[in-house]
Amino acid sequence: MSSLGTLGGARAGLGLLLGTAAGLGFLCALYSQRWKRTQRRGQSQSQSNSLDYTQTSEPGRQVRPLRAAPGEAGDAAVLSSLPRGQEVVLDRLEFVLTSLVALRREVEELRSSLQGLAGQIVGEVRSHMEENQKVARRRRFPFARERSDSTGSSSVYFTAASGATFTDAESEGGYTTANAESDYERDSERESDGDGEDEVSCETVKMGRKDSLDLEVEVALGLEPEAPEAGGSPGQEDVMPLLQQADELHQGSEQGKREGFQLLLNNKLVHGSRQDFLWRLARAYSDMCELTEEASEKRSYALSGKEEAEVALEKGNENAECHQWYAVLCGQLAEHEGIQRRIQSGFSFKEHVDKAIALKPENPMAHFLLGRWCYQVSHLSWLEKKTATALSESPLGATVQDALSSFLKAEELQPGFSKAGRIYICKCYKELGKNPEAKEWMKLALELPNVTKEDSAFQKDLEELEVILGE
């Protein structure tokens, strides 16, 4: 009986154990199925689209996967690889985006450059219009005006490029010539007493303008100007000694030219209506422009002299001296103008020099000026000639042979007229390949002393020609 009880208890324990194991197995199978179902659902929701965007479990939100840069997540960071086609599309999109950014930057730079260019053009046009308005007001109302300063300085109307060994220098006629010392070298050699004389000369100009203004105001109010102290109106016999003295002072030293300018300026109120007086006054302004070193003062003298020459031409168009000095002053004033005004002054210079030669063909200075103009034009670059042609209806045309003919004509009319002229002849012959003639004219140039600033400036070029041509 006891054995049967023991056997029954053992069977009951075994059944309980089997039931427990079966329950645990069922729970494990159920949990495994749920876990697999959750994994499959998460994979289906995280599939990537063709544009490499990942859809998250939250609807309406898309996040673009970031590529790990070297050093950000470590070199061992591994991202899920994309199909080959999607990688190519992504690279192309990145290239297009980079190109668009670069293109936008270039467009912005181009826009800023165009704005700057437009502003410069507008400024030049406005300056040109203001200058025209000033000229119109000056002709209508005889009032003096202040001169504007100018810091720019270039060649009168063209810059002749005659080689690497030659530089530009300023001539007696007021326009730039080739083969000379630079402005900086001349500034370093200027003496202090010359500065004082320039200041006195400027004060003289201001006083002369004031006296002229007073006279014009009296005429406008209907008042008669005061008669000269000697009594009576000035006649031919009264003015001729004055004009002869002015001519002598013009041919003299720098101090003599200053005294001649002062003499003419003091007598402008009395003889300012005479053409022969006015062109001499314009010539004196040209002399002062040559003697002055400050750019603003040079422009002021050149502008005043050109105005006097214009008034002289209004009194008669058949005076060769009026045309000659008007041309010279155009060249001097062009040194302080822009490229367009310089080119226009160049054509005006040529026109009035031709008229001066036609009216007085035996004048050596007019032929010398024409030769220098032809020499400079013959050395213009192709781009400079095209620019001048675009700004004017008449094309530029001059050769070294044309310049040589004019220089030889001046030498024929007056042998030894200019040392610079003989140096120009030497250069022309050298450029034409005629070295024996060039050497002969070099020797003739060495015989003449330095008279003008241009002669002194050409001394260095003459020494270089001696080395090139030989003794």
Curated annotation (Swiss-Prot):
Gene Ontology MF term list: microtubule binding
Pfam families documented for this protein: RMD1-3
Skewed-composition ranges (Low complexity): 41-50
Protein's recorded name: Regulator of microtubule dynamics protein 3
Topology within the bilayer: Single-pass membrane protein
Its biological purpose: Involved in cellular calcium homeostasis regulation. May participate in differentiation and apoptosis of keratinocytes. Overexpression induces apoptosis.
Organism annotation: Bos taurus
Gene Ontology cellular-component terms listed: cytoplasm; mitochondrial outer membrane; mitochondrion; mitotic spindle pole; nucleus; spindle microtubule
Domain of life, source organism: Eukaryota
Residue numbers carrying Phosphothreonine: T159
UniProt comment concerning the protein's domains: The transmembrane region is required for mitochondrial localization. The FFAT motif is required for interaction with MOSPD2. The FFAT motif is involved in the interaction with VAPA and VAPB and its phosphorylation regulates these interactions.
GO process terms (BP): apoptotic process; cell differentiation; intracellular calcium ion homeostasis
